Amino acid sequence: MSDLSHIRNFSIIAHIDHGKSTLADRFIQMCGGLSAREMEAQVLDSMDLERERGITIKAHSVTLHYKAQDGKTYQLNFIDTPGHVDFTYEVSRSLAACEGALLVVDAGQGVEAQSVANCYTAIEQGLEVMPVLNKMDLPQADPDRVKDEIEKIIGIDATDAVACSAKSGMGVDEVLERLVHTIPAPEGEIDAPLQALIIDSWFDNYLGVVSLVRVRQGRVKKGDKILVKSTGKVHLVDSVGVFTPKHTQTADLKAGEVGFIIASIKDIHGAPVGDTLTLSSTPEVEVLPGFKKIQPQVYAGLFPVSSDDFEDFRDALQKLTLNDSSLQYMPESSDALGFGFRCGFLGMLHMEIIQERLEREYDLDLITTAPSVIYELELKTGETIVVDNPSKLPDVSAVADFREPIVTATILVPQEHLGNVITLCIEKRGVQRDMQFLGSQVQVRYDMPMNEVVLDFFDRLKSTSRGYASLDYHFDRYQSANLVKLDVLINGDKVDALALIVHRDNAAYKGRALTEKMKELIPRQMFDVAIQAAIGGQIIARTTVKALRKNVLAKCYGGDVSRKKKLLEKQKAGKKRMKQVGNVEIPQEAFLAVLRLDS
């Protein structure tokens, strides 16, 4: 296939649960990528976690051969992308390798905010977007309304959108036919010097770094010497190939194709995502425009439960960062938890997924502290600093201005749930920017503090709108706010890992709620445990976990009151002594209690 006109590179854009992984399964089945025995639901979601949660986390690539009605055989390079708002960067990376995208919309549910955002990313990158209506076999499918929504909300022509049902297989061949005609073939010269973009890479214990690349110009084969532009290092190619979805070696990868390169790179940072590869004989090749470095929105401390695991934890993080370029981390130490890392994530789901992957794939036991966003502080000396950890806040007297990050949140919601959504946004200190009625849905835009959005806004939004509202948000600016640091003291000692930054108006309520929650979670000891919430030197809430005590009077029967007093005093003195030397074990749930204050 030396001629590029036979190649089509595309990805699928869709909201969570609109059926993109099932559609991918149908494509693989129709093009004979796997035998009937190997076929299983959601073939591409290979991580256990992806299958359990039913979401796609990583982008996956597959090369299929499709014999079209015009008698030609087309090579389809298809990249599956995640739909959740936390994994938008995975989507933009996949789109950079394609010439077109299928916009899959559930014909019953209609357009959702997340697919709108990803669709704009695709259009900005100059991709041809082709709308597909999925789940047409459902009784509630309403294709005309949904076509209307696609045109009104996204603004692309949907009059001839293909209708199909990925589950039953209806109309899928029509989707492939249309795709071959609508999506343009890649451009590139096979005889030009090699120029390839790394879309994704992961670490294999046997093979070293495996990179998924899109070849723009030239060709690469086994035995070539490749140069990684950013590191300047040269590696020998061991094998190249494609996923069909099985790992299949090929003779070479040519311009326009998507496949993997293994060059026994042992250094984890040897082939960063977004980098350009070329042959060592042509080092002057231009660097391809990569992806913008994504900024984490949420920071949390991750600490190994046993300090002996620290080295393993560091290695695990390094390997995971290669596979997930948006994860950032730096070492941190806490008085309460010892040594660990402060990690940056894109959102709460991303944080949960990373923690679960670390615990499963690398067999670690971890404690996570409550997540926090990045604040900007202007000190009285005139300098501006950024703080991502509440325990690192300078003294209040030194701060002139406290600024919190504000995001612009776009929410699409059916009209009947609009009231609940507005109430929720106001409760989260949101300011309404505009509201548009689009068909049966309403699009509202709010400016909201990121702190409120990141923690549990998504879950609350889903529950108040019975799952119909969808959310997309992006960082807008920093804005002054009246914020304070809430410390938690246990038996008079500050626990740095439990500190959080809250708005002054909510401080007393949050303090009370937090101490109550901690009281339920900290197990009873042999002595009283005082839990206090404080702002600066002022205690705003307190609860006590009562001591467990033996009934020392059981052996007295009748007996004299002074005898009973003596025994009780003796017990009291013992408890007091114990309290001076006693340590309180704080369980993992207590660190995350901060998240669930409202529930």
Curated annotation (Swiss-Prot):
Keyword set, alphabetical order: Cell inner membrane, Cell membrane, GTP-binding, Hydrolase, Membrane, Nucleotide-binding, Protein biosynthesis
Presence of the UniProt keyword Membrane in the record: yes
PROSITE patterns: G_TR_2
SUPFAM superfamilies: EF-G C-terminal domain-like, P-loop containing nucleoside triphosphate hydrolases
InterPro entries: EF-4, EFG_III/V, EFG_V-like, EFTu-like_2, LepA_C_sf, LepA_CTD, LepA_IV, P-loop_NTPase
Topological type in the membrane: Peripheral membrane protein
CC per GO annotation: plasma membrane
Entry annotated with the keyword Nucleotide-binding: yes
Start and end residues of each tr-type G domain: 5-187
Its biological purpose: Required for accurate and efficient protein synthesis under certain stress conditions. May act as a fidelity factor of the translation reaction, by catalyzing a one-codon backward translocation of tRNAs on improperly translocated ribosomes. Back-translocation proceeds from a post-translocation (POST) complex to a pre-translocation (PRE) complex, thus giving elongation factor G a second chance to translocate the tRNAs correctly. Binds to ribosomes in a GTP-dependent manner.
Name of protein: Elongation factor 4
Species for this entry: Pseudomonas putida (strain ATCC 47054 / DSM 6125 / CFBP 8728 / NCIMB 11950 / KT2440)
Lineage, opening ranks: Bacteria, Pseudomonadati, Pseudomonadota, Gammaproteobacteria, Pseudomonadales
